[in-house]
Structures are given as C-alpha cells and as structure tokens.
Swiss-Prot record:
Residues 297-458, 506-601, 637-666, 781-806, 836-1109, 1210-1266 form a coiled coil. It comes from Vibrio parahaemolyticus serotype O3:K6 (strain RIMD 2210633). The gene is mukB. Residues 667-784 are annotated as: Flexible hinge. Belongs to the SMC family. MukB subfamily. This is Chromosome partition protein MukB. Plays a central role in chromosome condensation, segregation and cell cycle progression. Functions as a homodimer, which is essential for chromosome partition. Involved in negative DNA supercoiling in vivo, and by this means organize and compact chromosomes. May achieve or facilitate chromosome segregation by condensation DNA from both sides of a centrally located replisome during cell division.
C-alpha cells in the first residue's frame, strides 16, 4: 500500500529568535504553544515562505497591519529576518520514501521598500542521519557557528555521494518539482494557481470562513475541462446514437419496472389471498374434524351419561322404597325403645321407691325399737324418780318420825336380807356363784331370748301336735291349695301333686335365679346373630360387588392381602403414571416449543431454500452444503473475473482499435494531434501529408527511410523557427522539423541506402540509422486506408465478442451477486434440516404424545377407579373383619334357639311364680298335712312335754333372776342393818341420806324430763316415718300399676336390644339416605352435565353442520382454483409456503396493500382493470387467479422477443436486467468514447457535472459528522443553475427544434450555444458580452454550477455558512473543513497528472487556536487522524493538547541578544531525531 508523503521537519536559520532551529513536524498535529511574541507566527511564516516563495503573495497580516503606516511596505517577512543569509527548509519524505529538502534562501535587500530576496532550491537524496542544520550552518568553534551561503551549501552537500542540489530560477519550476515529488496537492502552472494555493494557506492560517474562497468556490473546487471545446465533430450522430440508446434503456427500464411491479404486487395480492384461503380451508378442515370428533365423543358421553342416569334412577327408586320401610321400622324401633326406656325408668323408680320403702321400714322398726327403749327408759327414770321421791319423803318422814324411820330401816333391813336370799336362790338355780345383782339384769335378757327360742320350739312342737290333732282340717286346706294350682286332683294324689308343685316352684325359683345369666347370654347370642347376619349381608354385597365369595377367614385374609397388595401396586403404578404423564406433558411442552420455534424459522428456511433452488438452477450445480456454496461462489468469482478480464481486454482492444482508427483517419495519421496545430503555428505542413499519395508498395520504404521523422513538420525556411519553438507551451518531446520545398519536396537530403527489407540512412560521418521495413506500413493514405479496413473489420469482431463477453460477464456477475446475496442472507439456515418435515415429525410426535397422554389418563382413571374399588373393598373387609369368625359359626342359631327355650321356660317359671307363689308358699307350710301319719302323735306329745319342762325350768330361772333384779336396789339398804345396831347415829345418817336423796331426786327429775322430751322426739320421728312409709307404699303400688299398663317386659336386656335394633335401623337408614343423597347428587350432576353436554352438542352439531356445509361448498371453489392454477402453471407462483405461517389478518393486510398498488398500476389498462375489479369479490377466489393469469398473459404479450428468449415474465425480468445492464454499459462506453473524442458537449457537461456532484458528495461524507461548538456538520451544496439546465436540456433533447442554430453556416458552435442560451432564457439580460464570449463561457461546465457552504448548527438546522452567524471557533472549524475539501479536490483533480506511486503531502495551518474549545481541538485531531492530514497550529501557552507534538516557545532577551527557548513534548507522532553536534552547540549557545 502506498503511503502518503509527510513533512518531517521545518528548519529555520537566522530568523528573529531562531538562529538554527529545527521543528520536527508530527505525523498528525504539531502545536506551537507560547505567549504573545513567543515566535509562533514567525515559525509559521518560515514554513509558508518555504512552501510558496512568492513575495508578491506573502503577506503576514498579524504583524504588520495593526498600527502600521501607509508608507510601510513590509509584508511581514522583512522584519522576521536577521541580517545576512537566512534559510527556511522543509524536510519531506514522499510516498516513494525519498528524502527531499525544499528550502529557500532569504536575505534582506537594503532600501526603504524592505524587500526580501528569495532563492528556492532543493536537495535530494540527503542521508537520513544528516540534519538540515548540518548543511545550512557551519561550526566555527565549540561555541560559535555561522550561516553558510548558498554556494557553500552546494559545496557542503557535494561531500555526500548521490546527493543532488538544484536551484530554481522560477517559482513555477520550484512548484513543478514539488508537485512531481508529491509535496503539494496541485500543479501550480501559473501565478493564478499560486495565488489560489496561497489564499488557501492564508485562510487556513488565520482561520474563519474566507470570503475570497467561498465567493470563488467553483475555481477552487471544480477543475477545468478543456475537452469540451473538442465536441464539435460528429455531434448530431453521437446525440442520435445516445438518444436511441437512452430510449432503449428507458423502454427496457419501463418494461422491467412494469414487469417487476405487476409481478410483485399481483403475486402478493393473489398469493396472499390464495394462501389465506388455503390456510383457512386447512383450519376449517381441522376444525371440522375436531368438531366431528368432539360431536361423536359427546354423543357417546351423552349415551353413557343417560345409561348411568337410568341406572342410578332405578337404584334410587328401589332405595326410596326400602328407605320408606326402614323409616317405619326405625320409627317403630324408636317408639319401642321409648317404651322400654320409660318402663325401665318406671321400674327403676319402683325399685328406687321399694329401696326407699325398705329403708323406711327398717328405719321405722328401728325407730319403734328406739321408742320402746325410750319408753322403757322413761319408765325406769319415772320409777327411779318415784323411788327418789319416796326416799326423800321417807327420809323426811323418818326424820319427822324417828320410830317410823326406825321401822322403815327395819323394813329395809328385812328387804336387804330378802334380796340376799333371792341372790342366793338365783345362784342355786343357775348354778353360778359369780352371779351378782348388777350382772343379773344382762343375764335376764339372755335368758329371755332363750325363753323366746324355747317358746318358739315349744310352739312348733305344739303346732305340730295341734296339726296332728287337727290333721283333717289341714288336709282339706292343703288339698284346696293343690287343686288351685294344678286343678282337680284325687285326694290320694294330693300329697304327690303337692310335692310336684313345690318341686316345680323350687325349680321355677332356680330358673328365675338364672334369669340374668340367661338373658346376658341371650343378648350376646342375639348380638352375635345380628353381626353374623350383617356379616353375611356384607359378604353377599361384597360378592355382588367384587365377585369374590368369602367362605372363611383364610379366604378373607387372602382377599384383604390381595387388595392391600393391589392398592400398593396401584399406588406405585399411579405414581409411575403421574411421572410418565409429567414426562409426556414435558415432552408435549417441548414439542409445542419446538413447533413454535420451527414455525418461526420455517418462513426464513423456505425463503432460503427457494433461493438455494434458484441458485442451483442458475448455476446448474448441486449445492449440497455450505462448503459447496462457498467453493462454487469462489469458482463463479474466478469465472466472473476471467470474463471481466476478457471483456476488459476486448474493451481495451476495441479502444485501441478505435484510437488507432481515429488516428489513422486523421490527416496525416499522426500519433500526436498537436502536430497539426504546431504545423500551422510554424507555417509548415506535415511530412505525412506530403507523402499522402504514395502507393502501398512504396509505403514500407519511405516509412523506414524517414524513421522517427516520418511525422516531421516540413517548413520552407528554418530561420526564425527557434524563436517560435521557445514560445511554444505544449509540444511533443521530440519534434522533427525539415527544411524543404513544401510544394516539391525532395528526399535527396537523406543519404539512404536500401538493403534487404531495411533502409540504412547515414546521418553524417559519425552517425547512421538502420530501419527495417514495417510489417504494417502506415505511411501514405493508401496504406492507412488498407490498415483502416483491416482495423474496422477487427473492430467489428471485437465489438461482437465484447458484447458476448459483456453479456456473459453480466450474467456471471449477477450469478455471483445471487451467490453473495444468498451467502449474506440465507446460508445460515439454507442447509439446516427441513423445518416443515421436522414440523410434521414434531406434530406427529405431539399427536403420539397426546394419544399417550390420553392413554395414560385413561389408565390413571382406570387405576384410580381400581384403587377406589380396592379401598372400598378394604373398607368393607375392615367392617367385616370383626365378624368374619361368626360366619363360620353354625352353632349360634342352635344355641340361640336353646336359650330361647330357656327364656321361654323362664317366662313360664316367672308366670308360675307370679300366679302361684303365694299358694305354693302356703302349701309348703301345710304340705305335710297331706302326708301326716297319725302314728306320730305320741312322739310329738312326748317332745312337747320335754320342751314344756325345759321351758318351765328356764322360766324359774328367769323368775328368780327377775326377782333378784327387782330387789337389786335393796342391796343399797345394807346400811339399814347397821343402823339398827346404831340407833344413836340414825338421825344424823338420815339427814345425810336426805340430802343425797334430794340430790338424787333432782337428777331423777331432770333425767325424766330429758327422757320424756327425747321420747316425744322419737314419737314424732316415728309418726313421720309411718306417714312416709304409707306414701311410698301407695306410690309404689301406682308405679306398678303404670308398669303393667306399658305392656313391656322391661328386663335388663330389653333396652340394649331396643337400642341395638334402633341403631341398626338408624345406621341402615343413614346409609340408605347417604346413598340416596349420593344418587341424587349423581343424578343432579349427571343431568347438569347432560344439559351442558346436550347444549354443547347442539352448538357443536350446528357449528359442524355449518362448517361442513362451508367446507363442502368451499371444496368445489377450491378445486376450481387449483385447477385454474395448475392448468395455467401458476400454482408454484401462488403457493408460497412461507405465507402459510402468517395469520389471516397479516395476509389480508398484505393483499389489501397490493390491491391498492394494483389499482394504480392497471388504471390505464381496461382488461386488467376489469379483471382486478372482478377479483375483488371475496366470495369468488378463482377470479383472483384469473386476474393473475390475465396479468401473466398481459406480460407475456409485452415481452420483446427480439431481446428476450422466454415466455415467462419472471424469467423475462432477469433477461431485462441483463439487457438493461448491457445497454447501460454500451451507453457508458459511448459516453466515455464521446468524452474522449469530444463529440457531445451536452453529454460531457452533464457527465462532468454529475461526476463533480458525486465528488463533492463524497467530500461531504467525510465532513458531515464534524463538530465545532454548536456546528454538527459541514457540507457543500451544489446545484445546477436553472437557466443552464434548460440549455443542457435543449442541447441533448431538443436538437430538432434548434437545427437552425447548429446547422447554420453563419454561426460558430460557440455562437450557436450563445444563441440557444438566449432562446431558452429570454428573460436574462446578456449585457455587452458578445455571443462568442458567452458561447466560450457556456462550454465551461463550471459556469453551470452554483456552490455554497452550509453548516448544521444547533436547532437552526442547515444554514448558509457565514462568519456573522457563527462563533469565532465555529467559523474557524468550518473554514478548516472547507479548506480540507479544497485540498482533497485538488488531489483528486491532479491524480492523473502525477505518478501513480505518489500520494501528496497534506498539511494545513491554524494560528491562534485559543478560539477553539477542547472539543473542537479534539475534533481537529480526529479529522487529522481520519483523513491522514498534518496540522500545524499555534496556541497560547495555557493550551496543551494531549496528543501530537507540542513545542513550548518562550522568547528571552539576554543583554542585546534575543532568542526563543523551545521545549518539545512528543506525542504519538514520529520519534525524535538524533541531534547533531552543530544543533547541540547552537542550543548550548542559545541557552
């Protein structure tokens, strides 16, 4: 790659403040930073002086204009120099890597004009290690140096081998050398070019928008085009050919556009509707099938639901009947339970009252005994009180009557003796010596008990004795009792029957005693029988439900184990089914996601596949994979390159042939068209014109004889020719001039000798020339015409081959573009698997998954039902488990029957006892009378006597003891005996005894009172007890009467049986009601489901009927549509698979949009308009196909068979593209040819204008994003003047109207142009300009254009670039952008003039960059980097850019010496160059 040339350094020698300073120029931006007067402008002035050493232009205003007087003629350069020789040198390395030192020597010229003498020179080939200062400055000593003169500089570089020094006498030569080596962008031929270049540099230096440049942008940006002046020949023929070609292009373009538009819009219109109907039909079919499936399924479900409903209703009716009976039984059982409970409560009350009655009887007896004891105690206390009273009275009497007392004491002594005698008697009778008066009382009670027993025994014996004595009477009584029990009986059998009755009574009593045990057993057996019956019912129900007969516990256990295992298995299976269902659902979701994904990529793949198929058809190669596509694309590219190369070679050959034909057709057949003008200038003729009439045979000889001089100019006199030659500006490098007679030229001046096939010409004694005969002689008109004939024939062949090669190249290029477009858009998906096939597979897989899910759900439902059945079975078995053992027990009924018999016996026994218990009891008492033996009477009498004697003895003992008890208080009179012996103490003793007796009396009275009170209390309690007893007794009798009225045998098991019966019936009733509720819920839910299902069925049936009608009706229409499409071979155009994935709304929108476009497209075609109007009927889709067929037919008729070899409009578009490309290329080639031959002024002007517009547009692209402050972009606005545009239109398109101007011999072409301009623009005043001058201006295309600069500033948008509308920084940035456009334009303009391996340097200036903000400076840096430009800016010392190279300049004054101290900061530019010894010495000297 060719690199752009770069300025490497600027060297200043002997300038103010700079004795010998070299500034390295950065590859991008070099910044000179310093305060005012630091030397920034001086440095830039030195650079500009070395670049444009023209003192007439140099004017450094910033140092001269401010405050300068009119008399001062200093242009700013004189004052910047020191006396003596000064240098400014630019070190440049160009694109060829050549080092060049362009320098100028400056020296002040004495005088008031302050002129400066400037001498430019260049040093080429200087070694890289040698610095410019090493050449321009000479070291005198270690501390001194001097500036060399230019001759000394030349001598100094002579020391280096290969270094060239060249001084220039003119600035033109200096700039020509600069242009040749790529230092400046434009070739500066004259002062005008230099002035433009300087104005550009000046505008760059001082910034802002230069009015001098903006006012004449056309001169700066638009290059001259002198070839327009050569457009006079063959104008009409060239215009006619171009017009024909343009007409063919327009026709082909119109046909192509029409074909494209109609094909695209009609295809979109019809295909969208076609695919919408196809999609709709497919969806309707799917909906119909779905509805039919749902309809049949709903019917089956409805039938099943109806069967279930009928079955449940039947069961419900049976259940209601049984429930009514159960309710009656339950009510009866509840009533019976109520009676039993009432009877039991009554019996409990009777028992409770009887208990209370017995308790009251006991308490009454106890109270009676207590009362008796109380009475006895009262009697004893009364007796004691009476005795005490009597004792007191006696003592008082005794005290009153001592004798009486003495008698009393004697009486008491006698009583005491009698009591002792009674004690002795009792001891004797009882034989107990330990008997005392105190113990006698207790013994009396004991003996009385014995007396009672003895009395009873005596009475019994006496009774028996009396019975025996009264046997006859008792026998009759006993016989009556027996007969009352057993009925009539013989007297002799009475005793036996009495025994039987008594035995039966005893047995009945024994049976009655077993009542509780038997009834408990009866309850247990009855419960067991009920459980057995329920168990057998459960077994029957289980057998009916599960078809398994439970015969024993083993079968029961096996069945329960089977169901338990089945439940476990089913639960595991259900878990597996749930997992499988989850997995299947996940697979279904994955399949749905995959379907969505495939449906999303299917249109892209279909488009890619269609593109691939089209590419295969175009290429004729089976493109199997990406590698094959890329490989064949490379092959196509190589083929296209080969065809393009062949086409280019043929085009080049055609151009060569045309150039050669043109040259040979020109007068003299000269290679250089300038020779004719030079001949006219020099007043001679061409040698070839003199020999124009030679024969073909002589042509080789004369061509070889004259050799290079065959195109010489023959003049009659050579005198004065040299002066004319010096004045020539443009002439061939070698120009031969021969003196001779033009009218009678003689070749004798040539010393020629003809050899074999050659000529030897002796020039002089020391030179000779040997020239062979040319194989193809071109000297002379005959030879040229012969050559022209051959060249024209060859040109025809080349043109034909070129056309064929162009067609093939265009076709191959389009194929490569197709490959390129396919690779860019479709290669990523084209070779992927077919998504439609994958869709079918995934949909089939999803269908399988759906079926598997349905099977799994059915299995799960079946398993759930089985699980529920097994759980119900286990529940039934669990209910049956406690009673399973009873099923096998066949003895229950026998035992129950046996107990029933016992219960019956019990009832009979209880009835017997209830009826005859009292009679039997009486009978038992006198039963013996029936079998009494009269012989037993004596024994009974003897026994009676013995018992009587024993009783009499006991009574004696009791009497003796009673006497002793009665006399026991006489033992207290033991002192009376002593008193009888002590009569003197009797009185005192009596008094003491009286006191004791009174005390005893008082106690006795108290005790009597207490005893009487207590007895009264006891009597009251006894009375209350008697009344309570009587009331309880009456209540018990009433309760017994009520109990008999209940009519219920309220035994212990009656309530339990009643409760069990009621609970059993309640449970059965509850179960029945639960089942009834379940049946009713089932019926209700089933009816609701059936109603909903019937409603849904009607709706589905209606929808199905409507859809089926629609589908059947649409089928016929669709078949007609398909038939039309297939018969007319448009189905493949209409059936676009990618549209199958669009919604109906999208397709309808697509069709409607195309319909609107088609209405406009066919508005001028009656047939298509009518067909389109008919096709808008949505009810007739076949009409859209008919419209599409009509469009195809219409396009087939429009196909030009002369250029298109197909009947298919789609394929015709491709061939039209090829034809259009061929015609366009032909026109382009002709325009190029016309431009080269200057045959069409208007075409060249238009083309030139278009080229410059495109070039300016490219310039705008580089600057559109530039930002300075509020300015966000800079652009050049170029437009054609309306008046000149009308002129161009008249030149190119209205030639027939203006034949009077261009075919008139009265006007030159320039005058005709001026006249035409006046004709087409009558409103424009031409002023004083002549038609010739105006015509020459009209031949310059730059006068046709208007240029202006616009900026995009803030909210104002694009506006005219004027300094007043912009800030200073914005104006500077905008100005730099404009200048950069100019530089780029100059480079493009001069590219053809310079060597191809040279890219010129690009550098601009900017002084006082302080007016730019940091962002704008950054934009400049970015601009330099992007456009490979160098920038030299001056900025105040407070600005230090982060990038590039920055030099800090500080001007210092030491005594009378002034210098600038420089510090360089390297950025990202080039590396520092090593300093030379001289430079180091100079820097040391300056410091």
């Amino acid at each position: 790659m060719i690199e752009r040339g770069k300025y490497q350094s600027l060297t200043m020698v002997n300038w103010n403040g700079f004795f010998a300073r070299t500034f390295d120029i950065d590859g991008l931006v070099t910044t000179l930073s310093g305060g005012n007067g630091a030397g920034k402008s001086t440095t830039m002035a030195a650079f500009i002086t070395a670049l444009i050493p023209d003192q007439t232009l140099l004017h450094f205003r910033n140092t001269t204009e401010a405050g300068s007087s009119q008399s001062s003629r200093d242009k700013g350069l004189y004052g910047k120099l020191q006396p003596g020789a000064c240098y400014a040198a630019l070190d440049v390395v160009n694109s060829r890597n050549q080092r060049l030192l362009f320098a100028v020597k400056l020296q002040q010229v004495a005088g008031r004009d302050k002129k400066v003498d400037i001498k430019p020179f260049v040093i080429q080939g200087l070694p890289s290690h040698v610095k410019p200062t090493d050449i321009l400055v000479e070291s005198v000593s270690a501390t001194q140096a001097r500036v060399r003169q230019i001759n000394e500089v030349k001598d100094a570089i002579a020391e280096f081998e290969g270094v060239q020094f060249k001084a220039f006498s003119s600035i033109v030569d200096y700039h020509a050398q600069m242009f040749e080596f790529g230092v400046i962008p434009k070739k500066l031929r004259n002062s005008s070019d230099r002035s433009k270049f300087y104005r550009l540099i000046e505008a760059s230096l001082y910034g802002g928008i230069s009015s001098a440049i903006t006012r004449s942008l056309r001169d700066y940006l638009l290059p001259q085009n002198g070839g327009v002046k050569k457009a006079f020949q063959d104008m009409e023929s060239a215009l006619r050919e171009n017009r024909m070609t343009l007409e063919a292009i327009k026709t082909t373009q119109a046909d192509r556009d029409l074909f494209k538009h109609l094909i695209t819009e009609s295809t979109n219109y019809v295909a969208a509707d076609y695919m919408r109907h196809a999609n709709d039909r497919r969806n309707k079919l799917e909906q119909t099938l779905s509805l039919r499936s749902e309809l049949f399924g709903s019917r089956e479900t409805l039938i099943e639901q109806n069967n279930l409903l009928n079955r449940v209703q039947e069961e419900l009716e049976l259940l209601i009947e049984s429930e009514s009976a159960l309710e009656q039984d339950y009510q009866a059982a509840s009533d019976h339970l109520q009676l039993v409970q009432n009877a039991l409560r009554q019996q409990e009350k009777i028992e409770r009252y009887q208990e209370d009655l017995e308790e009251l009887s006991e308490r009454l007896e106890e109270q009676m005994m207590v009362v008796e004891e109380a009475q006895e105690r009262v009697m004893m206390v009364e007796e004691q009180a009476t005795v005490a009273e009597e004792e007191v009275d006696s003592l008082k009497t005794q005290l009153a009557d001592y004798q009486q007392a003495l008698d009393v004491q004697q009486t008491r002594a006698l009583q005491y003796q009698q009591a002792v005698q009674a004690l002795e008697k009792a001891k004797q009778l009882l034989g107990d010596d330990c008997l005392t008066a105190e113990s006698a009382q207790a013994l009396v009670s004991e003996l009385k008990n014995k007396e009672s027993e003895s009395t009873n025994a005596l009475l019994s014996v006496k009774h028996k004795l009396d019975m025996s004595s009264a046997a006859a009477e008792q026998f009759e009584t006993a016989l009556k009792l027996v007969q009352s029990i057993v009925g009539q009986v013989e007297r002799k059998d009475a005793a036996e029957q009495a025994k039987i009755v008594i035995t039966k009574a005893r047995e009945s009593q024994q049976i009655a005693q077993n009542e509780q045990q038997w009834r408990a057993q009866h309850r247990d057996l009855e419960r067991s029988l009920n459980q057995q019956r329920q168990a057998r019912e459960l077994v029957k129900e289980y057998q009916k439900q599960f078809h398994v007969e439970l015969t024993d516990e083993i079968t029961f256990e096996q069945e329960r184990e089977r169901h338990a295992m089945q439940i476990e298995t089913l639960e595991m299976t259900q878990e597996e089914l749930r997992e499988q269902r989850s997995e299947q659902r996940r697979l279904e979701q994955d399949a749905a996601a995959e379907i969505n994904k495939l449906e999303a990529i299917a249109p892209t793949w279909i488009a890619a596949n269609d593109a691939l198929e089209k590419l295969r058809e175009q290429s004729g190669v089976d493109l199997e994979d990406r590698h094959a596509v890329m490989s064949h694309m490379q092959v196509v590219l190589e083929q296209e390159k080969e065809l393009s190369l062949a086409k280019d070679k043929l085009a080049e050959r055609r151009s060569q042939l045309e150039s050669e034909i043109e040259r040979l057709a020109s007068p003299g057949g000269s290679n250089d068209p300038r020779l004719k003008g030079l001949a006219d200038t020099l007043g001679g003729v061409l040698l070839s014109e003199i020999y124009d009439d030679i024969t073909i045979d002589d042509a080789p000889y004369f061509s070889a004889m004259y050799g290079p001089a065959r195109h010489a100019i023959v003049v009659s006199d050579l005198s004065g020719i040299e002066e004319k030659l010096v004045e020539l500006d443009d002439c061939p490098e070698d120009l031969y001039i021969i003196e001779g007679d033009i009218d009678a030229f003689d070749d004798s001046s040539f010393d020629a000798e003809e050899l074999e096939g050659a000529v030897c010409v002796r020039m002089n004694d020391r030179q000779m020339r040997y020239s062979r005969f040319p194989e193809i002689p071109l000297f002379g008109r005959a030879a040229r015409e012969q050559r022209l004939e051959l060249l024209r024939n060859e040109r025809e062949e080349v043109v034909e081959k070129h056309a064929k090669a162009a067609f093939d190249s265009q076709k191959m290029q389009r194929l490569y573009q197709a490959f390129n477009q396919f690779v860019a858009n479709h290669i990523q998906v084209a070779f992927e698997a077919d998504p439609e096939q994958a869709l079918a597979n995934v949909r089939e897989k999803r269908g399988q998954i759906a079926r598997v899910l349905a099977d799994l759900e059915a299995k799960e439902q079946q398993h759930r039902s089985q699980l529920q059945t097994s759980k119900q079975a286990l529940s039934s078995l669990d209910k049956l488990a406690p009673n399973m053992a009873l099923i096998e027990d066949d003895t229950l009924q026998a035992r129950f029957d046996e107990l029933e018999e016992k219960i019956a016996q019990l009832s009979e026994a209880k009835a017997f006892l209830n009826n005859h218990a009292k009679a039997v009891a009486e009978l038992e008492k006198i039963a013996s009378a029936l079998d009494a033996d009269p012989e037993q009477f004596d024994a009974l009498e003897a026994e009676y006597k013995a018992a009587d004697e024993q009783l009499q003895e006991l009574k004696k003992q009791i009497f003796a003891l009673s006497d002793l008890v009665e006399r026991r208080h006489y033992f207290a009179y033991s002192d009376s005996v002593d008193l009888l012996n002590q009569s003197s103490e009797l009185s005192e003793q009596l008094k003491a005894k009286l006191v004791q007796a009174e005390q005893m009396r008082t106690r006795s009275r108290e005790e009597l009172k207490q005893a009487q009170g207590q007895m009264n209390q006891y009597n009251q309690v006894l009375a209350s007890l008697k009344s309570s007893h009587q009331a309880k007794l009456e209540t018990v009798q009433e309760f017994k009467q009520e109990l008999q009225e209940f009519g219920v045998n309220a035994d212990e098991g009656a309530e339990e049986r009643a409760i069990r019966r009621r609970d059993e019936l309640h449970e059965r009733l509850h179960t029945s009601r639960s089942r009834k509720s379940e049946y009713e819920r089932t019926i209700t839910s089933t009816e609701l489901e059936m109603k909903g299902l019937a409603k849904r069925l009607k709706k589905v049936q209606k929808e199905y009927a409507e859809l089926r009608t629609f589908v059947v009706a649409a089928k016929a229409g669709w078949c007609s549509v398909l038939r039309l499409a297939r018969e007319n071979d448009v189905e493949r155009r209409l059936h676009k698979r990618e549209l199958a994935y669009m919604s109906a709304d999208e397709l309808r929108s697509m069709s409607d949009k195309s319909l609107g476009a088609l209405r406009l497209a066919v508005a001028n075609n009656d047939d298509l308009r009518d067909a389109l109007r008919l096709s808008e009927d949505n009810a007739r889709p076949e009409r859209k196909v008919l419209f599409y067929i009509a469009v195809y037919q219409h396009l087939r008729e429009r196909i030009r068979q002369d250029i298109i070899r197909t009947d298919d409009p789609v394929e015709a578009i491709e061939e039209m593209e090829v034809e259009l490309a061929r015609l366009t290329e032909e026109l382009t080639q002709r325009e190029n040819r016309l431009a080269i031959s200057s045959e069409s002024v208007a075409s060249i002007i238009k083309k030139t204008i278009q080229r410059e517009q495109n070039r300016i547009r490219m310039l705008n692209q580089g600057l559109s994003n530039i930002s300075f402050g509020q300015v966000k972009g800079v652009r050049l606005n170029v437009k054609i003047r309306e008046s000149h545009e009308v002129l161009l239109h008249g030149l190119s398109s209205q030639q027939e109207q203006h034949k009077d101007l261009f075919e008139s011999p009265r006007f030159t072409f320039s005058e005709a142009m001026a006249k035409l301009f006046q004709r087409v623009n009558p409103h424009i005043d031409m002023g004083q300009r002549s038609p010739q001058v105006l015509g020459e201006e009209l031949l310059d295309y730059r006068n046709y254009l208007e240029l202006s600069v616009e900026v995009n500033r803030g909210s104002d948008g694009w506006l005219q670039a004027e300094s007043g509308a912009l800030s200073t920084g914005e104006a500077i940035g905008t100005g730099q952008s404009i200048l950069l456009m100019v530089v780029q334009s100059w480079e493009e303009e001069s590219r053809r003039l310079r060597s191809k391996d040279i890219i010129p340097c690009r550098l601009l200036f900017l002084d006082e960059a302080a007016r730019l903000d940091a962002k704008s400076i950054s934009t400049l840096f970015e601009l330099c980097d992007r456009l490979d430009m160098q920038l030299l800016i001056a900025a105040p010392e407070n600005i230090s850019p982060e990038k590039g190279t920055t030099y800090k300049l500080v001007r210092k004054v030491f005594k009378d010496h002034e210098h600038v101290h420089v510090v360089g900061l390297r950025g990202f530019g080039q590396t520092d160059k090593p300093k030379s010894e001289v430079q180091e010495m100079i820097e040391e000297f300056e410091s």
